[in-house]
Structure formats: structure tokens, C-alpha cells
């Protein structure tokens, strides 16, 4: 077990404890070799905490094949180099200028999808469970089409519900009040909804034309089909109001 004296955002405690559990052993490089032909020369390595111990060996393996590897240092929201959270992509953005694409070590799209949307560079997933690799471009493009459709649907909305989380690490009341003021500047009505659990069934029955989510950034992405009204990220709300263009689209993050 290790502890950190650094305060984390929105936490009630100044001292946070991390239980450092060992990850699974790295048995084979088959899944890395499956990804290697899809990789550019300069690659940023990314993963979750489960596979973080594999990164040095994978880095050495790819460097022997001629790749230049970068592993981004963590910020105050993550503990390990190369680690991704669903709402924090610092270890990817900090090396963005030094790489031409990314290799994510893990299963599923949840963590690397945010990087693929945030940064216009290839993201390849190397899946150690299946022993396979794939490009995330098709999934990224599908999600961006969904986001564009949500923005278009919200263009004529007059009343917005701005969702604010009470959860530690997700509370962004300052952002929510700024967005409310921005809506009113453009002649729209906006009301704040302070919630512990954000779920579509808890938001039914309100006279709201569209939702703006300042809680976990992935709610608008992962749960979009569960909401009758369009649900936007803060940056998408700025596009609806004309404060930002689609060409300046960025993925929402919770950062220190």
C-alpha cells in the first residue's frame, strides 16, 4: 500500500491511500505483434492500471522493431505513467507533440475512445485477452456522427437542463453556473439539476428541451440512446450557442 500527500480535486481528504495490487503476468507478445503493422514510427503507449506493469517490456519490444516510444507522465488525477481514466487523458495529451499515434493496451473501447476523439491521430487497441489488435477509427467516426446529430437536434432548444454531479471528483458547479450564464446571454433558459446519481429515469417529466452534462463526461457519450432529449457535453453546448465551431470540437475532460 502506498499513500499520497497531494490533495486530489473535490476530495474531502488531504491524504489519499492507494492499494497497489499486482497485475496479471505478461505471457506473450502476440497481441503486440498483431498491432505492430498498424503503428506509426512514433507511438505513445497507453493502458489502465491493470496492465501498467507491462509497459516497459512492451516499450522495449517495439523499440527493437524500430519504433520510438513515449509514455506520458501522470498528473494529479492518475497514479501511473501511461494510465488512462475515462475522463482524464493527460498521459496521452502530454506526449501528443512527440507521437504520430497511440497504442492502447487493454480490452474494450471505453478508455481509448476518449483519446481517439480528443486527438486526431490513430489509436490502435492491442487486446491481451483475445490476442488481437484493431484500429479505433470506425468506432470514433460513429461516435462523432452521434455527437453531431445531438448538436443539430439541440439547435432549436429553448430550455436546457444543466446536470451537476454531487459525486467526489465530478462536481463542476463553477462550470455549470458559467454555462447557465452563457445560455442566458444567448436568450436561452437554463436550470441546474444537482444529482448524486445521473440516470435517464430520474430526469423524466421535466420541461427541458435538451440536457447539458457537467458530471462524468462519458454519460453523454455512452448513454446517449437512453435519453429522449439530446444530451450534450459543455463544449457541444458552446457549439449550439455559437460560442465554438464544430471544427473546434474537443472531448470533455475533468482535469485538475
Q: Can you name each region flagged by the protein language model?
A:
Residues 10-11, 19-23, 129-133, 217-256:
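Peripheral docking tails and interdomain loops at the edges
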Residues 42-45, 89-102, 142-156, 212-218, ...:
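A polyampholytic, Gly/Pro-enriched intrinsically disordered region
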Residues 76-79, 194-200:
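Short acidic loop-to-helix transition motifs that present clustered carboxylates
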Amino acid at each position: 500500500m502506498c499513500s499520497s500527500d497531494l490533495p486530489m480535486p473535490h476530495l474531502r481528504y488531504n491524504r489519499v491511500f492507494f492499494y497497489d495490487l499486482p497485475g496479471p503476468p505478461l505471457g506473450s507478445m502476440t497481441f503486440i505483434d498483431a498491432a505492430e503493422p498498424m503503428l506509426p514510427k512514433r507511438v505513445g503507449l497507453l493502458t489502465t492500471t491493470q496492465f501498467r506493469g507491462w509497459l516497459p517490456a512492451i516499450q522495449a519490444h517495439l523499440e527493437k522493431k524500430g519504433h520510438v516510444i513515449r509514455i506520458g507522465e501522470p498528473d494529479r488525477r492518475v497514479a501511473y505513467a501511461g494510465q488512462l481514466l475515462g475522463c482524464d487523458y493527460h498521459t496521452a495529451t502530454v506526449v501528443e507533440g512527440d507521437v504520430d499515434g497511440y497504442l492502447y493496451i487493454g480490452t474494450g473501447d471505453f478508455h481509448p475512445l476518449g483519446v481517439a476523439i480528443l486527438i486526431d491521430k490513430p489509436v490502435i487497441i492491442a487486446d491481451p485477452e483475445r490476442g488481437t489488435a484493431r484500429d479505433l477509427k470506425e468506432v470514433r467516426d460513429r461516435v462523432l456522427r452521434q455527437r453531431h446529430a445531438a448538436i443539430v437536434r439541440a439547435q432549436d432548444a429553448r430550455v436546457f437542463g444543466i446536470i451537476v454531479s454531487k459525486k467526489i471528483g465530478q462536481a463542476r458547479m463553477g462550470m455549470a453556473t458559467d454555462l447557465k450564464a452563457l445560455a442566458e446571454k444567448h436568450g436561452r433558459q437554463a436550470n441546474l439539476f444537482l444529482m448524486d446519481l445521473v440516470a435517464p429515469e430520474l430526469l423524466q417529466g421535466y420541461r427541458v428541451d435538451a440536457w447539458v452534462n457537467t458530471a462524468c463526461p462519458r454519460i453523454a457519450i455512452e448513454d446517449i440512446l437512453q435519453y429522449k432529449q439530446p444530451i450534450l457535453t459543455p463544449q457541444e453546448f458552446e457549439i449550439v450557442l455559437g460560442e465554438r465551431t464544430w471544427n473546434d470540437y474537443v472531448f470533455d475532460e475533468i482535469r485538475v
